[in-house]
Amino acid sequence: SFVINLTNEDMARATDWCGVRSGKDYNKFQEMHLTPQKAQKVAAPIILESPLSIECEVLEIKELGSHHMFIANVVNVQADERFIDPATDEFRLSDAKLIAYSHGHYYKLGEEIGKFGWSVRKNKKK
């Protein structure tokens, strides 16, 4: 099992540091002052500071030469209550200030660019 802990702007330094350091050589939780917490459905811990934690059970591991690809089922998702809209029970992505990593660079996420179905919605006639 494993957990995908999505990180945000506040965790950017820790995200990068943990990505370039080996857990064989460092206690990443201790070094980056992160809090491990028991997950609800899997043995791997979640990171308490993470806005969103996705708990997964491994189905298959595929060897791809230089690395492995894990095929898994998502068995639970935990969201930090600070980012849940109490009126709709929806995760407020823009408030969470999540980050993404691509080709050596980190990016901010969260600006809404449309709502579901906007691409096919017909213009209303007056």
Regions found by a protein language model. Give the residues of each.
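Basic, polyanion-binding surface patches
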Residues: S1-K126
